[in-house]
Amino acid sequence: MSEGKVRVKVCGTTTLPDALHAAAAGADALGFIFAPGSKRRVTASQARGISLNVGPSVARIGVFMGQSLDEVLRTAEAARVSAVQLHGPLPGVYVAAVAGYYPVLRVLGPEELQAGNVQAATVQATPGVTLMLDAPQPGSGQPLDWAALVPHFPPGSWLAGGLGPDNVAQAIATLRPAGVDAVSRLEASPGLKNPQAVEAFIDAVKRS
């Protein structure tokens, strides 16, 4: 990543047209959700088909929540993802094990970023793992209190949680994340993107 560039991840990708559009609009990464119960969940086969058509220039990130280590690694390989995003309460050894195979975005909530929190410190000290801050309920569309998080937000971390075309520039100006991730505010309906919102979001990030 070039100095100062904020990377853009369009998460909850479920269709090839949406993936191709996001890539053409300038997305750096696409997110495929494999977490049980998600309205945006895809199979490894679906994600693989999209990944192979989009090509290697755009990162493909598999999103998991509370799944076994074996399931994460098997699904990631079958889907041909290039990185893994991990949600939920997980031991450090689990995260480190995944990081032995793939770059990891480890998602934590605001309360876990407080000074002295063991999880946040462990994430920052684990090779191949980057912290991502998200809302307690991912995909809810509710933004975080960015100003309150300034003292706790580690440099080099990613930001998610209620980001959209209308507020991402302010979020970037406040926290200076290495990357931003959006889902619900880029959709026409769960799992289906609003092309204009995707373009506006990416443009707002690139201009920040």
From Swiss-Prot:
- EC no. given is 5.3.1.24
- Pathway(s) where this gene product acts: Amino-acid biosynthesis; L-tryptophan biosynthesis; L-tryptophan from chorismate: step 3/5
Single GO molecular function: phosphoribosylanthranilate isomerase activity
| Isomerase as UniProt keyword | yes
Q: Which domain of life is it from?
A: Bacteria
Which UniProt keywords are given for this protein, alphabetically ordered?
A: Amino-acid biosynthesis, Aromatic amino acid biosynthesis, Isomerase, Tryptophan biosynthesis
Task: Tell me what reaction this enzyme catalyses.
Answer: N-(5-phospho-beta-D-ribosyl)anthranilate = 1-(2-carboxyphenylamino)-1-deoxy-D-ribulose 5-phosphate
Q: Which Pfam families match?
A: PRAI
Q: Which InterPro entries match?
A: Aldolase_TIM, PRAI_dom, RibuloseP-bd_barrel, TrpF_fam
Q: Which GO terms describe its biological process?
A: L-tryptophan biosynthetic process
**PANTHER family documented for this protein:** N-(5'-PHOSPHORIBOSYL)ANTHRANILATE ISOMERASE
Annotated family: Belongs to the TrpF family.
Task: Kindly provide the name given to this protein in its UniProt entry.
Answer: N-(5'-phosphoribosyl)anthranilate isomerase
Which organism is the protein's source?
Deinococcus radiodurans (strain ATCC 13939 / DSM 20539 / JCM 16871 / CCUG 27074 / LMG 4051 / NBRC 15346 / NCIMB 9279 / VKM B-1422 / R1)
Q: What is the gene name?
A: trpF
